[in-house]
Amino acid sequence: MEIQFLGTGAGQPSKSRNTQAIALKMLDERNEIWLFDCGEASQHQILNTAIKPRKITKIFITHLHGDHIFGLPGFLSSRSFQSSDEQTDLDLYGPVGIKEFVLTGLRISGSRLGYRINFHEIDSAGKIFEDDSFEVYTDLLDHTIFCLGYRVVEKNRVGELDANALKEAGLPFGPLFGKIKKGEVVAYDGKTFDPKDYIGADKVGKIVTILGDTRKTKTAVRLAWQADLLVHEATYEASESKMARAHGHSTTKQAADVAKEAGVNRLLLTHISARYVGPLVGQLVREAQAVHANTFVSKDLYEEKIG
């Protein structure tokens, strides 16, 4: 898995930071990309990346403030134009009201999509998605309006099959290898091949937590518990805690406190106020790293491998 930031600014676009959008690239795991928030000009930012819109199969909206949703109608329309003839449906998760916002924009603009949007409006905490390889949980944060955080959990995967050991034990390469990989005991040529003798330890899945706008809250700690990566907003520097609370946001130190309390490995900060440019960004980094060393202040188009 990889994460890429399409927008890292707060409130409105600036010369150096676009509004909020984050791509969680799961190409090796499921040949998909999941998008978290879709602020103004997100589709333009995508043009500066290797992301293909048709690969985006799920969008998770944290809340309905404009800097997190104003890019949705344009992106959804362009996805029709840029995709192949066989267009894939898209799942859209978010607070109650996201369906009305999207459908109203598409209707008034006369836009017609070549694919179906499956809307999943959320009004409470819990598990919102599960398949054979991933689970997604959500919970309510502490912002000025209803706002969500998301916890993406990759399930453990079966360990590597020791093909050389099987061959040396007398099992010819073929379909029986697949049965052993699935956990089946195989009998061949008078011998029994037990999967536990030829499959390594399970590969532990990654945990990624992406939060919307929020004051410091215990909910954030729960969502981020033992995560490999936490994406947390840090709109203000540490000395502006009163300002942050008044506007429903967090400081660098508060975000780092959450990461430390939750036992997070890596913390990436986003939703940075436009007042912080140049050397001031370094100040934000130092404030957070004083609490949680493995921290970085994200910038637009920044990308890194998870774990």
Curated annotation (Swiss-Prot):
The keyword Chloroplast does not apply. Gene3D superfamilies: Ribonuclease Z/Hydroxyacylglutathione hydrolase-like (3.60.15.10). Zn(2+) 2 binds at residues 67-68, 213, 271. One of its GO terms (molecular function) is zinc ion binding. It is an enzyme of class 3 (hydrolase). Zn(2+) 1 binds at residues 63, 65, 143, 213. Its cofactor is Zn(2+). Its EC number is 3.1.26.11. SUPFAM superfamilies: Metallo-hydrolase/oxidoreductase. Keywords: Endonuclease, Hydrolase, Metal-binding, Nuclease, tRNA processing, Zinc. Binds 2 Zn(2+) ions. It comes from the Bacteria. It catalyses: Endonucleolytic cleavage of RNA, removing extra 3' nucleotides from tRNA precursor, generating 3' termini of tRNAs. A 3'-hydroxy group is left at the tRNA terminus and a 5'-phosphoryl group is left at the trailer molecule. The active site is at 67 (proton acceptor). It holds the Pfam family Lactamase_B_2. InterPro entries: Metallo-B-lactamas, RibonucZ/Hydroxyglut_hydro, RNase_Z/BN. Zinc phosphodiesterase, which displays some tRNA 3'-processing endonuclease activity. Probably involved in tRNA maturation, by removing a 3'-trailer from precursor tRNA. Belongs to the RNase Z family. Homodimer. This is Ribonuclease Z.
